[in-house]
């Protein structure tokens, strides 16, 4: 309670998403439970570390760098759920450059043990994260999104098909969307 009365300390919970992304059926539930608990205490949430772990079986776990969209779309789904359901106000990735595993946005290939020579390759994951960063700016506000069926009836949770289309919209501080 000492920190909660200090006006210089933000009322934030910083979290890591390890082991909360599978099974898919729990991805949303865990984030909604977190949001409900933090709302009771008027505490904001920042997702401060995420990477691919061994339990992320849908994409083969964390081993082996992935040049395809599979990991990028998997992580985009996590970002969507963190922002939409946990109401994360900030979202951060674990590692920028790495070896032969999925948590590096850029793959490094060294020819010596000193990392003084070699080459790098980007990943689709880097571009997926870049699109969130490019278009959803600090201070952006998430807008309400609804989905309707062909008769005009509201589809409950129609903004999120966990294995398909997920929709969220944002308005930036400068008025851009």
Identify what each model region corresponds to.
Residues 2-4:
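Short, small-residue-biased leader/transition segments that mark boundaries at the very start
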């Amino acid at each position: 309670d000492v920190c909660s009365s200090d006006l210089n300390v933000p009322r934030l919970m910083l979290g890591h998403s390890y082991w909360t992304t599978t099974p898919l059926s729990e991805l949303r539930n865990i984030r909604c439970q977190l949001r409900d608990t933090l709302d009771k205490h008027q505490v904001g949430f920042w997702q401060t570390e995420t990477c691919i772990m061994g339990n992320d079986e849908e994409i083969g776990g964390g081993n082996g760098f992935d040049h395809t969209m599979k990991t990028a779309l998997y992580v985009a789904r996590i970002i969507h759920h963190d922002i939409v359901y946990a109401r994360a106000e900030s979202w951060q990735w674990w590692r920028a450059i790495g070896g032969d595993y999925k948590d590096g946005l850029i793959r490094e290939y060294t020819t010596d043990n000193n990392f003084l020579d070699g080459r790098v390759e980007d990943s689709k994951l880097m571009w997926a994260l870049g699109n969130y960063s490019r278009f959803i700016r600090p201070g952006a506000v998430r807008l309400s999104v609804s989905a309707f069926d062909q008769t005009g009836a509201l589809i409950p949770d129609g903004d999120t098909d966990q294995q398909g289309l997920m929709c969220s919209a944002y308005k930036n501080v400068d008025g851009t969307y």
